[in-house]
Amino acid sequence: MCDCHALDRRSLLRAGAGVATVGALATFAPAAAGAVRTQTFRGAFTSPDTPDWHYLPIKVPREVREIEVSYEFHPTDTGAGFSYNVVDIGIFDPSGHDLGNAKGFRGWSGGARRSFGISRTSATPGYLAGPITPGVWTIVLGPYAIVPPGTEWQVTVTLRFGEPGPGFEPAPAPTSVPGTGPGWYRGDLHLHTVHSDGKRTQPEMITAAREAGLDFIGSSDHSTSSASYTWGRHTPPDFLVINGEEVTTRSGHWLATGLPAGTWIDWRYRAGDDQLQRFTDRVRAAGGLAIAAHPFNPVPSIRWEFGYDYAGIDAIEVWNGPWTGDDQTAVEHWHSMLASGT
């Protein structure tokens, strides 16, 4: 193990609003089949106003069979409500990590898990299996919440060398299923599996939905499209799964619903960046709808900050999870919009 990348806040090089690059390019030397190479990177987030996204570039050589990444940080719960350190993580491949670059996206788990792996054959839920292309891969750290005195972090990258396994074979869910004729169909468009922060696997989600009397569900894992590649392995022929994503920005969440399998929508922007319309337009161009999720949730970074005129949004969610005061506020707001003809 090489621990040659100890970093602190002074080594964070600003690369634009809400973005920082963590240190210099880290390089792994080529190795023979069967070899394993590991490097560890350390740093710290010491301020609540640290940039939203920190990029750790890793140069991956040829003949790598699998990439494994693990990370650690200190939650430091203050005991004062939603007030503790949370650091998210994800990765992009050499196709790039610029805003909206779906070709480079290879997965995101937020703060839901502490490690992941990617190979040509398989990947941890939340991540995309596929070729381990040589070049610069970029690990993304997202300090979702930082409380004083902050937190140190550690990222460990392991490369396993060897022949690639067989290619991953996608199995998306059918885009339509036989109905029962005119009438009401019952479903839920806002659900999470183990592909983000949910507790249920895809088969468990289908079972729970059937037991609840649902005819369809919307797959809406946070910030990743990975579940859409495998729903077809678990979905009965008479049950509809609608692909989607909960686009989890730092200025509120919105559902991209009705997407073609494999479609990924970026979330690395805030209300002041003037990017929402760009990505809701992308959803509609793909045949989907953009829905403001839990718009009156009071939690920072979840609270809707894109404006209550809902410019660029097709619908709003008025009930999310157990009924609470913010659901009541959403219903009243929705009713006032209907009454005013908005």
Language model segments and positions:
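N-terminal signal peptide c-region/cleavage motif recognized by signal peptidases
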Residues: 29-30
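Edge beta-strands of jelly-roll/beta-sandwich modules across compartments, strongly enriched
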Residues: 147-158
